[in-house]
Amino acid sequence: MDSHQELSAGSPISYDFLDPDWCFKRYLTKDALHSIETGKGAAYFVPDGFTPILIPNSQSYLLDGNSAQLPRPQPISFTLDQCKVPGYILKSLRKDTKSTERTPRPPNAFILYRKEKHATLLKSNPSINNSQVSKLVGEMWRNESKEVRMRYFKMSEFYKAQHQKMYPGYKYQPRKNKVKR
């Protein structure tokens, strides 16, 4: 193949980048994730029905404003849900956005009780798992006296007041149930 080929527009395009010495590597998306995380690469998601055109930096003159060699693509925006994004990338992207947007709920009386009792149960019984701990804590909560329960309800009211000061516009909005297939 010639290193230059004429297009109908009459401008030469170099195909030197097709030379085997050019750093053309096949990457699995999962393998490329490290390069993306370290800032040595970028991820671009291509929706169904589109084909990406990759041009090495040495050929970037093809994209300058005066060049009529390639058709100019029109910008189209897609949501992540419209793109076929590998789950491990999508999960980390959603995790990053949710962590800044989501406001935590204030703990209720049982949650405060469970948090305190969970650690003590695990210390006294290191071989039990979380589901067993949950069952035991639930039983313990039901058997607690009114005075003990009142103490946790008062603690939860304190945390609720603190929460209102920190997040004045907060309103709990439960997730809608997804329809099971």
Curated annotation (Swiss-Prot):
GO molecular function annotations of the record: DNA-binding transcription activator activity, RNA polymerase II-specific; RNA polymerase II cis-regulatory region sequence-specific DNA binding
DNA-binding region: 103-171
Alphabetized CDD domains for the sequence: HMG-box_ROX1-like (cd01389)
Note: There are three genetic loci for mating type genes in fission yeast, mat1, mat2-P and mat3-M. Cell type is determined by the alternate allele present in mat1, either P (plus) in a h+ or M (minus) in a h- cell. Mat2-P and mat3-M serve as donor of information that is transposed to mat1 during a switch of mating type.
Protein name: Mating-type M-specific polypeptide Mc
UniProt entry keywords in alphabetical sequence: DNA-binding, Nucleus, Transcription, Transcription regulation
GO process annotations (BP): cell differentiation
Keyword Nucleus: yes
